[in-house]
Amino acid sequence: PYVQFVHDSMRNNMPWNEFAHQLLSAKGSGWSEGNGAVGYFVRDKGMPLDNLSNTMRIFTGERMECAQCHDAPFNKWERIQFYELAAFTNGQQEINRGPWNTVWREVRDAKEERSEFGRLVEWLGDNVHYFTLGGGGKGRIKLPSDYQYRDGDPGEMIGGKTHFGKRIRSSDRRDDESARSDFANWMVASNDNFTSVIVNRMWQRIMG
């Protein structure tokens, strides 16, 4: 469904800002008609910080990979800023886990986890049943246990914050279920980077 969504979007000439917004804000079942965009986050299941790095590079041209672990030595990004952005998409999970959990429990009780049947059940869970996305982002996140700078403490809860374009923030005291939607709105409507990146890429493709 995710690949089909991408193909259909290109075939129907969906505007770039609408396409990006759907990728960043979609939720629910990826098997629902027209909802394949949830695959953007499901594809990186278990790797939300890597997803944030990719998102910033794809849609804004900002290279934040280094700032995931330390202040970047060759650009402006600091580790605290990386986590402030990651807060907007933090806290997503699969929905409707119950039915598959019941099946997997039976497989486990029968000690069939490593059998061909067990591997098939696991694959179906990961690639079919769990092609879903719940949660609108918490809008807050804990700094990692190895956080090493004076602007935060290991394990400290921080709220979301953008650092260019329109400034948006979220609280570090309570979850904000609109955080991911707010992040998507900011991405496509509130910063010049989003526009310049796609223009530069199209120019390079045309002009070589």
Each predicted region: which residue ranges?
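Individual transmembrane alpha-helix segments
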Residues: 164-168, 186
